[in-house]
Amino acid sequence: KLPEMEYSTESKDSSITLWRLQKNQVLAYFTYEGHDAESHLSSQLNAPAYYTDQSDTWAMIRVSGKRSRDVLERICPIDLSPEVFTVGRVSRTIMEHIGTIIFRDGDDSYVLLTMRSFGRSMLHAIEVSADNVL
């Protein structure tokens, strides 16, 4: 079943997480080391859909730890409080003028995706925020 807008859902075996960010678009978050991710995903989901591999266009950064929310709140304009941005929530936002997808995958863990050309800039923004918070 597809998740509601800005939520995620996991496959039965937890190997694939689906993110719903737009009405007609779902992103699949999973680990796969082959060269045919589209075929792999199609066989795993067994659902009639179009699949496009976009893994080479994204830089992914995980921010985790007891103060991870404090670090991200300095650069993220959305409400990351645990009551609002619960585990499993996903959203598109702008962080430090950079388009970003943020996914909360644990109590103190967030996954950030940004266009790969902005990866170093995003990492720098996170490091500066961490230096100011920690």
Q: PLM ranges: what are they?
A:
Residues 1-134:
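Basic, glycine/lysine-rich polyanion-binding surfaces/domains
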